[in-house]
Amino acid sequence: MATELLCLHRPISLTHKLFRNPLPKVIQATPLTLKLRCSVSTENVSFTETETEARRSANYEPNSWDYDYLLSSDTDESIEVYKDKAKKLEAEVRREINNEKAEFLTLLELIDNVQRLGLGYRFESDIRGALDRFVSSGGFDAVTKTSLHGTALSFRLLRQHGFEVSQEAFSGFKDQNGNFLENLKEDIKAILSLYEASFLALEGENILDEAKVFAISHLKELSEEKIGKELAEQVNHALELPLHRRTQRLEAVWSIEAYRKKEDANQVLLELAILDYNMIQSVYQRDLRETSRWWRRVGLATKLHFARDRLIESFYWAVGVAFEPQYSDCRNSVAKMFSFVTIIDDIYDVYGTLDELELFTDAVERWDVNAINDLPDYMKLCFLALYNTINEIAYDNLKDKGENILPYLTKAWADLCNAFLQEAKWLYNKSTPTFDDYFGNAWKSSSGPLQLVFAYFAVVQNIKKEEIENLQKYHDTISRPSHIFRLCNDLASASAEIARGETANSVSCYMRTKGISEELATESVMNLIDETWKKMNKEKLGGSLFAKPFVETAINLARQSHCTYHNGDAHTSPDELTRKRVLSVITEPILPFER
């Protein structure tokens, strides 16, 4: 019997309406003589500028999205009808999670499927309760004596939810020489579970480091002819990026399509996952329309032609940072800030002169609207748009929560612009910083700290003085995901930047500081990413100074960094894969299935 239609809104073709012409290839930065004529009117300023002078250009790819179509589309308002259906399905799944008679491994696999399918946020307290019962009843000790799969799965789930479990759980699967037993490689499911568990390691956990090497070496030896198409897809998916570092929505859509192929799939769980995915997608569409209207109203993309117009990519990034449906304010805030960051980064990196950049930095530090009188005309529009947007965000927070957050927002922007300015000085002076000097500035110029400051005030309901103090200091909760953001970004762009002779990049600075090859420097940067993840894992286990929703948001920023920069710079140069991902998360619903 066919199930009810779970598609809440019409699917949008990959090549129809939403896209403009295909994107051209990236062209290397070249100097040009630009005659710029801008005529801009806002409520507070109007100007006309004509200037002819040498300016650099990065020849960025143009925006490939049709904003008019986005603004004209309308989400199916019948979403309310589906909420009742979702509640009934949710109740059935909740009963399964809370079934105290369920076998340990059955329970663990159910929890794993719930989370992979994007439903974890619906069952947080139920999952925590089930894991509490699992531990208190001796479940962890029991599964470690029976199978590697059960041991690895329970280890990963427990660490993910803040339980302290020892890596020694894997000692029973090693021989007398301390090596993992060779016969384990015959159990592909167990090796996959071991691989995923190894990414929850802390600093100094050598057993898990060895487990990762062991699992990767055996998984890479497998072929589709040997293990079958379905299992090969799972292996390739895992090797591309481990589950712990994947963004939630992309993993959900992949897992739903993989799960529906299973003969023993839980149909109630699958139906809820599809319904939930499409319902949340309709929320994203509403959010995107709101943000798109703001972007059109601001008008920077049409006036500053030298800069990247990346609103859709910025919104997609924001979904990765805060995917839960209740965090619309966070998504809109982060998307707006990343759109500004992208354009202002191009001003500092490409277009502005050093004198102009110092003026702009001073204007942001002063946060005085009269500072626009000291700026060149193209900067006036940008500063005033930034000034009005941030003041509006601060006003809304004061109105809704009674907190004046403007000083914290403006400080974050001043810090970012100063970091941008330092990079511009290195470029203009043609100097190569040491790796430590570069990275001490670069993790801030990634914009990670700024985005997380804005995210904090959007997701945290009860703002605490201690949290504010640590927010301003860019506590480890903020700095470490920003480190990963910068390192992932630099890995994606290093080869191209080195070829152009640019010096300020993690890889190039590491090469010069250590006197090593690009290959070795790249490997070292990847190791830094792994070590940073171990520190973040430790903080999550040990408890954070910040509220849990913000901690998860910060970790998600690191995950989105992997997603965006894993196969190149998908923010600067979005390719076909990036566009497909954006569509799958934001516009294309998952079609219903047949029972």
Curated annotation (Swiss-Prot):
Pfam families found in the cross-reference section: Terpene_synth, Terpene_synth_C
Reported cofactor(s): Mg(2+)
Cofactor notes: Magnesium. Can also use other divalent metal cations, except copper and calcium.
Alphabetized Gene3D superfamilies for the sequence: Farnesyl Diphosphate Synthase, Terpene synthase, N-terminal domain
Molecular function via GO: isoprene synthase activity; magnesium ion binding
Amino acids binding Mg(2+) 3: 489, 493, 497
Signal peptide: none
Catalytic activity: dimethylallyl diphosphate = isoprene + diphosphate
Family (UniProt): Belongs to the terpene synthase family. Tpsb subfamily.
Designated name of the protein: Isoprene synthase, chloroplastic
Gene: ISPS
